[in-house]
Amino acid sequence: MMTKEQIIEAVKNMTVLELNELVKAIEEEFGVTAAAPVVVAGGAAAGAEAAAEKTEFDVILADAGAQKIKVIKVVREITGLGLKEAKDLVDNTPKPIKEGIAKEEAEEIKAKLEEAGAKVEIK
């Protein structure tokens, strides 16, 4: 019998195709599925919890406005993202900038982004 470490080492050495076949074989052998219903349930529970307490807020960039460069600079400052990542985020609005933060911090971020010319929502 193989130890857990030996199994992990064997999995590390497999190709993506081999891993896919392994997952299918495990699903068939044990009658389980690798789908993620747990993630869906976890997301729903987190949403219900946030609605009940409302102590955590999300800052959503609704629109970058006309001064995208200023908005990108502020997004980089707030998130610590690189230039390309911040530009992609600003170009593909609406997108969350920060999630699960206190109301005071959300208001500060909103003010900074609006000062740069962006339209922002707090949810």
UniProtKB/Swiss-Prot annotation:
Gene3D superfamilies: 3.30.1390.10, Single helix bin (1.20.5.710). InterPro entries: Ribosomal_bL12, Ribosomal_bL12_C, Ribosomal_bL12_C/ClpS-like, Ribosomal_bL12_oligo, Ribosomal_bL12_oligo_N_sf. One of its GO terms (cellular component) is cytosolic large ribosomal subunit. It comes from the Bacteria. Disulfide bonds: none annotated. Pfam families: Ribosomal_L12 (PF00542), Ribosomal_L12_N (PF16320). Keywords: Ribonucleoprotein, Ribosomal protein. One of its GO terms (molecular function) is mRNA binding. One of its GO terms (biological process) is translation. SUPFAM superfamilies: ClpS-like, Ribosomal protein L7/12, oligomerisation (N-terminal) domain. Belongs to the bacterial ribosomal protein bL12 family. Homodimer. Part of the ribosomal stalk of the 50S ribosomal subunit. Forms a multimeric L10(L12)X complex, where L10 forms an elongated spine to which 2 to 4 L12 dimers bind in a sequential fashion. Binds GTP-bound translation factors. NCBIfam families: L12 (TIGR00855). Forms part of the ribosomal stalk which helps the ribosome interact with GTP-bound translation factors. Is thus essential for accurate translation. This is Large ribosomal subunit protein bL12. It comes from Geobacillus kaustophilus (strain HTA426).
